[in-house]
Design a protein with these regions (language model features):
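Hinge/capping helix and adjacent helix->loop/strand transition within the periplasmic-binding protein
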Residues: 84-90, 104-190
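Short helix-initiation/N-cap motifs at beta->coil->alpha
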Residues: 70-78, 126, 183-193, 206-209
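N-terminal twin-arginine translocation
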Residues: 1-9, 14-29
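Alpha-to-beta junction loops
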Residues: 85-93, 152-154, 196-205, 218-220
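Short, polar/charged alpha-helical segment
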Residues: 46-62, 166-173
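Extracytoplasmic "Venus flytrap"
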Residues: 36-49, 72-73, 158-164
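C-terminal lobe and pocket-closing loops
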Residues: 125, 210-228
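Short, well-ordered beta-strand elements
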Residues: 32-41, 66, 91, 153-157
């Protein structure tokens, strides 16, 4: 039995994956259906990537993995529910950089992001993309920054306070030196919907959830947070 909850985190490496069969055999794991918690809304970048990874993992382990979405409070609500589960490896948490940043946004967390979890499968990175409504007429980030400075009333959407999308947009705001009001939602899909509707000026969202909307011409991409 593990002494800490199992934690699936988004990172740049996947070296822990090959060790899974040996670990499972040694501990006779799993013995029943596995629950994988995604602490953000269905359709969010983390949800999309999590489902892609859980499918082959389920086949490899020979056990069903049921994904549960419980968004809100920058991922801390769903994460807190995992802490309360039996620490036997049958409840997994699929998280991202928001996990380590949570204490900065929520000083009174009911759990410790480090001590209460064991990171077992780092499996990828999701670059953020800055997107706006096509009607804005922006072609570059410089266009957005110039308009924001001139307006003084810009808004940006995120998947919640303390989410990776929140920090990405806030970093862009600080680097650009303009003021903008943060409008948090329970998940990325809601944030993208508001930008598409023109009710919020921009968002820095995970590429996996924003890309289909960019390809359909519903959003315009201004910048990507990677070299790709």
């Amino acid at each position: 039995m593990t002494t800490r909850r199992t934690f699936l985190t988004m990172s740049a490496a996947a070296l822990a994956m090959p060790a899974l069969p040996r670990i499972a055999a040694a501990q006779k794991y799993p013995t029943r259906q596995i629950r994988a918690m995604v602490p953000f809304a269905a359709g969010s970048s983390l949800d999309i990537v999590g489902r892609i990874v859980m499918d082959p993992l389920s086949r490899q382990l020979g056990q069903t993995i049921v994904i549960e979405n419980r968004g809100g409070a920058g991922g801390t609500i769903g994460t807190a529910s995992v802490v309360k589960a039996e620490p036997d490896g049958h409840t997994l948490l699929i998280q991202a950089s928001a996990h380590s940043a949570a204490p900065a946004a929520y000083p009174k967390l009911s759990y410790d992001p480090v001590r209460d979890f064991s990171a077992v499968i780092p499996f990828g990175t999701i670059p953020n993309v800055t997107v706006v409504h096509p009607g804005r007429g922006f072609k570059t980030v410089q266009d957005l920054v110039a308009a924001a400075k001139k307006s003084g009333k810009f808004t940006y959407a995120s998947a919640g306070v303390g989410s990776a999308t929140h920090w990405a947009a806030e970093r862009l705001r600080l680097a650009g030196g303009y003021d903008a009001v943060h409008v948090p939602f329970k998940g990325g899909p809601e944030a993208l919907t508001e930008v598409m509707a023109g009710r919020v000026d921009f968002t820095c969202m995970g590429m996996s959830s924003a890309l289909p909307l960019i390809r359909d011409g519903k959003l315009v991409a201004l910048a990507v947070s990677s070299a790709a």
